[in-house]
Design a protein with these regions (language model features):
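Metallo-beta-lactamase
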Residues: 2-103
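A generic alpha-helix preference that emphasizes hydrophobic side chains
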Residues: 9, 44, 107, 224, ...
Length: 376
C-alpha cells in the first residue's frame, strides 16, 4: 500500500486465523495525512483505495482485524462497518477538499469550512485524536497545490521578525496591542490572541508580558484540543515562552549502529551533501577518492559550485584518496569511533593533500538539535 501511512507499507491476511492485519492503514482514530513533525504529504485517495481493496479481498473471510498500534475489532459485521467508515472518511476528506479547491477556496478556507458528515464523525474511531480534519484538509491542498495559494500578497512576505515589527507599529505599539489582546483573551478568543501576540513576540522576544500572554493563550488552546498532537504543540510552545528551549539528554542519543550499517554509501554521501555549508564552500573546489578496503568498493566526492556531488569509482587528479574499511566509516558516522584514533591506529589512511580533505570535512555542518520554535 505505497503512499498511505508510510511510503512502503502492506496489509496482510492470515487465512489460518481468519485475521487481517491492516498495519497503520486502518486505526482507531483519524490518522495523519501530514504529520505535524514534518514529512511528505500522504495520499488520501490512495489510502481510501487500499482500504477498499482490502475490504474486497479479505473482509468476507475475516473474523478479526487488527493494526500495528491499536486494538483489534472482532466479528465480521463489526469489522466491515469499521473498515468501510475508515475508508469513506479518507475518501470524503480527499474528494470534498478537491471539490472546494476547484471552487477557488484555499487550504485555510477549506479547513474552516469542511466537516465530516454525522454518519462518519460520530464514530469514535474516526475522531481527530491524532490527525485532524483541519490539518489533513490543508495537507490535501498542499499535495495538489503546494504552499502558494495564488494570492500575490502571499508570494513574497516579510519574515516573522520584520513583519512583527511593522504589525506592532501599525497596531499602535506594544502596549496598545497587549491591551487589545488581553481583552480578547478575557472573551476566550484564544486563537486570535495567539495570532496577534505572535507578532509582538517576534518583534520583541524580550517582552515578558507578551511572552506570558502568548503562553497563556497557547495553553488554553492546548487544553481545548481534542487532538493530542495539537495539544502537545500548544503546550510545548507555552513552555518555550515561559522557560526558553529546555534541553534534555535526548540530544546526545547516537544513531543506532544497525541503522548506519543498512545505509548505502550513496545515502551517507547524500547526508553529507545536505549538511554542506554552501556559503562557506564558495570558491572552493575539492576532489576526494574514497576506497573501502574491506569491500573493494571505490567512490569519489567532488566539491564545486558550492555543491557536493558523489559517484561510483575513482577519478583522475583527485586532491586526496581516503582509504578505510566500510565498518570504520559506519562507526565514525554512528559516533562510536574517534576520527583521530582511527588515523593513529592505521584503520584510516590518506594519500595526497590531507589539508584539502580536512577542509572538505570542516565544511560539513553538524545538526542543531535544539532550536527556537515560537520565538525568533
Amino acid at each position: 500500500t505505497p503512499g498511505t501511512e508510510a511510503p512502503a507499507e502492506m496489509n496482510f491476511f492470515f487465512p489460518q486465523f481468519s485475521s487481517l492485519c491492516m498495519a497503520e492503514n486502518c486505526s482507531h482514530n483519524l490518522h495523519n495525512l501530514l504529520t505535524l513533525r514534518g514529512a511528505q504529504v500522504r495520499d488520501a485517495r490512495a489510502w481510501a483505495h487500499y482500504l477498499d481493496e482490502a475490504i474486497g479481498l479479505f473482509a468476507g473471510e475475516s473474523d478479526l482485524v487488527f493494526t500495528s498500534h491499536h486494538w483489534p475489532v472482532w466479528g465480521r459485521e463489526r469489522l466491515l462497518a469499521y473498515m468501510k467508515k475508515q475508508r469513506d472518511m479518507y475518501r470524503y476528506l480527499h474528494d470534498q477538499t478537491v471539490r472546494l479547491m476547484n471552487k477557488g477556496l484555499t487550504g485555510i478556507e477549506i479547513a474552516e469550512t469542511l466537516q465530516l458528515p454525522e454518519e462518519l464523525a460520530r464514530e469514535w474511531y474516526n475522531r481527530g485524536y491524532y490527525g485532524s480534519v483541519s490539518h489533513n484538509v490543508k495537507a490535501i491542498y498542499q499535495r495538489y497545490m503546494g504552499w502558494f495559494d495564488a494570492n500575490p500578497a502571499h508570494l513574497h512576505p516579510l519574515t516573522p521578525v520584520e513583519a512583527g515589527k511593522k504589525y506592532v507599529e501599525f497596531m499602535g505599539g506594544a502596549d496598545a496591542l497587549l491591551a487589545n489582546a488581553r481583552e480578547a483573551y478575557g472573551k476566550g478568543d484564544y486563537r486570535w490572541v495567539a495570532q496577534v501576540v505572535d507578532h509582538l513576540v517576534f518583534a520583541d522576544p524580550d517582552n515578558k508580558e507578551a511572552r506570558a500572554l502568548q503562553a497563556d493563550a497557547l495553553e488554553q488552546l492546548g487544553y481545548q484540543a481534542e487532538n493530542a498532537t495539537w495539544r502537545n504543540f500548544y503546550l510545548t510552545g507555552a513552555m518555550e515562552l515561559r522557560d526558553g528551549v529546555v534541553e534534555s539528554a535526548a540530544a546526545g542519543v547516537k544513531m543506532p549502529p544497525d541503522l548506519v550499517r543498512s545505509l548505502s554509501p550513496a545515502t551517507i554521501f547524500d547526508a553529507m551533501a545536505v549538511h554542506l555549508n554552501g556559503p562557506n564552500a564558495a570558491g572552493k573546489t575539492i576532489t576526494v577518492n574514497l576506497r573501502f578496503t574491506d569491500t573493494g568498493q571505490d567512490y569519489h566526492l567532488i566539491l564545486e559550485n558550492c555543491v557536493l556531488n558523489h559517484g561510483e569509482g575513482t577519478v583522475d587528479g583527485a586532491d586526496a584518496t581516503l582509504s578505510l574499511p566500510r565498518t570504520t566509516l559506519d562507526a565514525l558516522v554512528a559516533g562510536d569511533s574517534d576520527p583521530a584514533a582511527a588515523f593513529t591506529s592505521g584503520e584510516v589512511s590518506v594519500e595526497g593533500d590531507g589539508e584539502k580533505l580536512g577542509l572538505l570535512f570542516s565544511l560539513v555542518d553538524a545538526d542543531e538539535f535544539w532550536f527556537n520554535i515560537v520565538t525568533p
